[in-house]
């Protein structure tokens, strides 16, 4: 009977949550469960494309599409609401649009920027966090070029951009900037030699997930296109002028008209309020992706700190992992509904590609290093495949990179 259907509640329509729902609706009949998906926006956005929208190499509208395009309305109730409280013991979730009970819960609330308590970073630096922050940043950068061109008294700081962090997001953003800046210089009649791009990284090495050869390739590519790197240089503060860094024990002020922070993310702040043992918005999973003490609550994606059996550190937060977790969670939910035991999650690492603008990149694919146009092509394949898996061939054709 319909009233006996188990209530499956999925929070978040990012890669993990939406993958869970799209697989569930394929594998379950309409009367197998009452599935509800809650997301604070009516759209899903490709968070792995935010660096492009932030630089202005794509329009912000290019990276989003309506969640309704991906869900089967006969099987899934999609609710646009913001989650305000998760009561795991009462099996209830509160939102700004009402209260929802659950039998099985999937928490996939995504990430927010993490500034590690650096003084002034939240107030004075742009964050690459979501569609709105990316749109704001790209407009700001173009406005700086327009203002410079229109001003009688030129301020070269308008053409200076500081990027905090030489990890994945920072390097991909810099790559996009090296594509975008020649366009802006041409559009506004600006001498490109006056543009200054500086990347500041506290660690002794950038892109730590890659080999020294790949890192050297990426550094040379970006340096040849005007990027200056300050490695092993911690940022200790951010103000209206730019970053304050520490060099040989002394503080120095780096000045720029635009400061961007890319060096950290964390899970949703709601995690600390809802679960125990949470660090930086992430909770440690059991091997089947549920959490300790709750065999009917799955935590996946950026809110998950999954440590594979026999290892000591959690897997990183990537779209590839999030989507695999979503698929596995859907399979485990089906098992629970059928009265079967859940299965452990096994991550398959197919590789990682870091773009350097639209036509270059570096990466590891099934254990092999790749670089150049081959890497750039593969990145486009990966991006398009993600859309296909969530929204099907039609959406991939419309929104994909080909």
UniProtKB/Swiss-Prot annotation:
Its cofactor is FAD. Keywords: Cell membrane, FAD, Flavoprotein, Membrane, NAD, Oxidoreductase. It catalyses: a quinone + NADH + H(+) = a quinol + NAD(+). InterPro entries: FAD/NAD-bd_sf, FAD/NAD-binding_dom, NADH-Q_oxidoreductase. Alternative, nonproton pumping NADH:quinone oxidoreductase that delivers electrons to the respiratory chain by oxidation of NADH and reduction of quinones, and contributes to the regeneration of NAD(+). Its main location: membrane. It comes from the Bacteria. It is an enzyme of class 1 (oxidoreductase). Binds 1 FAD per subunit. One of its GO terms (molecular function) is NADH:ubiquinone reductase (non-electrogenic) activity. This is Type II NADH:quinone oxidoreductase. The active site is at 172. The lineage of its organism: Bacteria, Bacillati, Bacillota, Bacilli, Bacillales. FAD binds at residues 12-16, 39-40, 83, 302, 319-320, 379. One of its GO terms (cellular component) is plasma membrane. The keyword Cell cycle does not apply. Gene3D superfamilies: 3.50.50.100. One of its GO terms (biological process) is aerobic electron transport chain. It is found in: Cell membrane. Belongs to the NADH dehydrogenase family. Its EC number is 1.6.5.9.
């Amino acid at each position: 009977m319909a009233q006996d259907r188990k209530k499956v509640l999925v929070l978040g329509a990012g890669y993990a949550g939406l993958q869970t729902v799209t697989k569930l609706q394929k594998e379950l009949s309409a009367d197998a469960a009452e599935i509800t998906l809650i997301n604070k926006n009516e759209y899903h956005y490709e968070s792995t494309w935010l660096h492009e929208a932030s630089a202005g190499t794509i329009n912000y509208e290019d990276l989003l599409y309506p969640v309704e395009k991906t869900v089967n309305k006969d099987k899934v109730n999609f609710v646009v609401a913001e989650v305000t409280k998760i009561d795991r013991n009462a099996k209830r979730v509160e939102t700004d649009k009402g209260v929802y009970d659950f039998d099985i819960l999937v928490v996939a609330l995504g990430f927010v920027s993490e500034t590690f308590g650096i003084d002034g970073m939240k107030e004075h630096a742009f964050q690459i966090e979501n569609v709105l922050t990316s749109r704001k940043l790209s407009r700001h950068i173009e406005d700086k070029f327009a203002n410079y061109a229109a001003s009688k008294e030129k301020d070269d700081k308008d053409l200076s951009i500081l990027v905090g962090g030489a990890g994945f997001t920072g390097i991909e953003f810099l790559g996009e900037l090296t594509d975008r800046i020649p366009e802006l210089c041409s559009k506004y009649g600006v001498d490109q030699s006056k543009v200054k791009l500086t990347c500041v990284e506290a660690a002794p090495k950038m892109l730590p997930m890659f080999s020294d050869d790949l890192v050297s390739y990426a550094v040379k590519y970006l340096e040849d296109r005007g990027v200056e790197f300050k490695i092993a240089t911690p940022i200790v503060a951010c103000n209206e002028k730019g970053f304050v860094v520490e060099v040989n024990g002394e503080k120095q002020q780096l000045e720029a008209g635009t400061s961007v922070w890319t060096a950290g993310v964390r899970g949703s702040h709601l995690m600390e309020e809802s679960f125990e043992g949470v660090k930086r918005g992430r909770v440690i999973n059991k091997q089947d992706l549920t959490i300790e003490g709750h065999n009917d609550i799955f935590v996946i994606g950026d809110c998950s700190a999954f440590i594979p059996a026999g290892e000591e550190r959690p897997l990183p937060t990537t779209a590839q992992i999030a989507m695999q977790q979503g698929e596995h969670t859907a399979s485990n939910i089906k098992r629970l509904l059928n009265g079967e035991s859940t299965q452990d999650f096994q991550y398959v690492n197919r590789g990682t590609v870091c773009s350097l603008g639209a036509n270059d990149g570096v990466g590891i694919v099934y254990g092999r290093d790749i670089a150049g146009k081959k890497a750039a092509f593969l990145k486009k394949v990966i991006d398009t495949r993600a859309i296909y898996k969530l929204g099907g061939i039609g959406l991939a054709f419309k929104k994909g990179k080909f």
